[in-house]
Amino acid sequence: MRHTLILSDLHLWQLTDHDDMWMRYRHRQFAPDAQLVALVERVYAQIGSDPLELVLNGDIFDFDIPPVIAGHATPAPSPRTGEQASARLAAILDDHELFIAALVRVLSRGDRVVFVSGNHDIQLSLPEVQECLIARIRSRLPAGFFHNPDSRDCESDRLSEQLQFFPWYYQSADGVHIEHGNQY
């Protein structure tokens, strides 16, 4: 039996330990990464060897939250280009290694990860941003993940089958229509 786990609105952001009261939610202790890892492990304990499809349904990242510069949240416009958004995503990912570990866990087992863009991470529809995330995941996949570690084509083919991006909605193999819903 195939299982689908749908999560949305994690709003991963750059973390800061600065003591601004209005930005306290950005402290590492409030990041949802450890809970996500625990959730994935609980799901795997329940489903055994059945296949899993993890659908990350929008606002997984939050490109609108001010970036951290010199330890402080600094108001800045949302990234508009692939280059700007990739740099922002790389900074976010630097603070969320456990999130990447959870994705690697799912992919390493041969399961799928699907990203659907939301209103706070619409930049995921940009190829440069997708490649930034793919590169981070690829760098942490075990060597045994690839059929032929010397072949980048094999690596890309397998990863592109298991890790997919959709700009608006996703239709699962079981016919379930999944969208973030910010269009309404």
Q: What is each PLM-predicted segment?
A:
Residues M1-Y184:
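Extended recognition/assembly regions associated with phosphoester-bond processing machinery
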